[in-house]
């Protein structure tokens, strides 16, 4: 990231405590849309829906079906938040790419604009939630959770309200049938250029599940805190507990709006230019008929901060030098109606390296005597391991030396589910390729965080505890 480093307003008093920084509106405003999240355009009767972000007053951000092309005004990402007793994925919220705000059903508006849709919500609640109702042929109706009515495009309106979207119909006709048209948001669509550099020398990579959403564990000091505070504390933990400045850092369980503050804080504390990218965790959108094969994915939202600020989506982040020219997010094969887990890769052409961060599905664990893991039998984690290897293999074919890992949610007892990774890479807990799959614990008494690199290199692996998360940070020094 080529910009001036952030001037810290507050010095952290202790690395083990969370220091609440003053609200920084510039950082909140500059928090990017999900770097690699899927994006969609909505099409009805042959035209695309636009958010009129240049309109003023109570018309600002109103949605109209009126465009023949797709730009940022016509681009939306889908999000899903937790509904008590129901969970994620049963409703979606739409966030506009241009202004970063959620689409709201204005159910308190009266007259001809009653129930009109506007991109103006800073949080997702009942006014921002919509049920997805399949109509066949790849079309869907949207039913507002605020008033139980279908969204209609008012093609008979004239002037500035022509094509206005309103939640006002009790039945579905052609004006209520929408098509979600994918607008690629995964990152670069092609592969990176062939590397002209052969990686050599020493490489330092770290990985840390920072537990910064709403985990109730007392060890998760960053639950429900805002992005500025997460960025400051996480960067301080990296800086204070590692003996060497890492060249790449993998983060898991982080909220989207902590990404920009984290980037600035890494630059301030570690020096140099950093580029921090984000990839969301998804849920398959569950239609009103109970099916989850709609083809739509919605990003899991982080719980709001204690100050009721929206913290964006939940997922993983990858910090590398700001000279990287290629990045891409992936959705790994995951259990149906569970979290659809992400991977995120970025190249650094000047060193001939590529870095891939992943967060695999949770294994077997119990809450109140009930199985709470997404993948207790390891079937999905094995598929995720195979998929990550396939991603890395293609990048390696382009001449890049890969470093990969993250929170793979796999203990030594079930490490065979990672066999495809061990077959072609060496893990930092292994002094030699043939050494046991071993290493210091990273979560309680278990090792579930891993860092891999080329086989045959010289490896050193340490685990440190900045006391901010229920996970410890794992740090690999790999000499080629």
Per-range role (PLM):
Residues 96, 144, 319-322, 344-351, ...:
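Active-site beta-strand termini and strand-to-loop segments that position acidic
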Residues 29-58, 72-111, 126-158, 174-190:
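Extracellular glycan-recognition/adhesion modules and their associated mucin-like linkers
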Residues 191-193, 390-403, 409-480:
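Metal-dependent phosphoester-hydrolase catalytic domains
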Residues 191-193, 197, 254-352, 360, ...:
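Structured beta-strand-rich core segments of catalytic domains in phosphoester-bond hydrolases
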Residues 342, 346-381:
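Metal-dependent phosphoester/phosphodiester hydrolase catalytic core
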Residues 1-30:
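Secretory targeting and sorting signals
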Residues 23, 183-268, 278-293, 300:
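N-terminal, active-site-proximal structural segment of metallo-dependent hydrolase catalytic domains
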Residues 204-210, 220, 237-263, 319, ...:
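Active-site beta-strand/loop signature of hydrolases that rely on acidic residues for catalysis
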């Amino acid at each position: 990231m080529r910009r001036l480093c952030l001037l810290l307003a507050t010095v952290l008093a202790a690395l083990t405590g969370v220091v609440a920084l003053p609200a920084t509106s510039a950082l909140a405003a500059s928090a990017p849309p999900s770097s690699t999240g899927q994006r969609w355009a909505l099409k009805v009767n042959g035209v695309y829906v636009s958010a009129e972000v240049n309109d003023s007053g109570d018309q600002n951000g109103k949605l109209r079906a009126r465009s023949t092309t797709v730009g940022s005004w016509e681009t939306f990402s889908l999000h899903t938040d937790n509904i008590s007793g129901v969970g994620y994925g049963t409703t979606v919220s739409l966030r506009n790419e241009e202004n970063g705000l959620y689409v709201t059903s204005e159910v308190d508006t009266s007259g001809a604009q009653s129930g009109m849709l506007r991109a103006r919500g800073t949080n997702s609640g009942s006014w921002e939630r919509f049920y997805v109702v399949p109509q066949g042929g790849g079309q869907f109706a949207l039913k507002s959770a605020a008033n139980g009515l279908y969204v209609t495009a008012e093609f008979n309106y004239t002037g500035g309200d022509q094509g206005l979207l309103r939640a006002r119909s009790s039945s579905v006709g052609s004006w209520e049938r929408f098509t979600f048209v994918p607008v690629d948001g995964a990152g670069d669509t092609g592969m990176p250029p062939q590397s002209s550099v052969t990686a050599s020398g020493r490489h330092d990579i770290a990985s840390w599940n920072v537990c910064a959403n709403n985990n109730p564990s007392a060890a998760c000091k960053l639950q429900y805190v805002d992005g500025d505070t997460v960025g400051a504390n996480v960067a301080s933990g990296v800086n204070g507990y590692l003996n060497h400045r890492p060249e790449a850092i993998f983060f898991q369980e982080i909220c989207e709006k902590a990404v920009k503050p984290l980037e600035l804080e890494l630059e301030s504390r570690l020096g140099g230019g950093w580029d921090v990218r984000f990839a969301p965790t998804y849920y398959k959108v569950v239609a009103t008929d109970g099916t989850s094969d709609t083809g739509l994915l919605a990003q899991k939202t982080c719980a709001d901060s204690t100050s009721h600020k929206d913290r964006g989506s939940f997922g993983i982040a990858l910090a590398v030098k700001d000279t990287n020219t290629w990045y891409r997010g992936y959705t790994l094969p995951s259990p149906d109606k569970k979290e659809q887990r992400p991977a995120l890769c970025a190249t650094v052409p000047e060193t001939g390296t590529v870095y891939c961060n992943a967060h695999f599905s949770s294994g077997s664990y119990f809450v109140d005597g009930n199985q709470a893991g997404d993948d207790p039998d390891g079937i999905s984690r094995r598929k995720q391991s195979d998929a990550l290897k396939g991603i890395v293999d293609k990048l390696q074919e382009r001449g890049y030396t890969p470093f990969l890992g993250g929170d793979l949610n796999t203990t030594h007892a079930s490490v065979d589910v990672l066999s495809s990774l061990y077959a072609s890479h060496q893990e930092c807990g292994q002094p030699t390729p043939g050494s046991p799959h071993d290493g210091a614990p990273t979560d309680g008494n278990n090792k579930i965080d891993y860092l891999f690199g080329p086989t045959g290199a010289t490896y050193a692996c340490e685990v440190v505890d900045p006391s901010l998360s229920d996970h410890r940070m794992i740090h690999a020094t790999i000499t080629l």
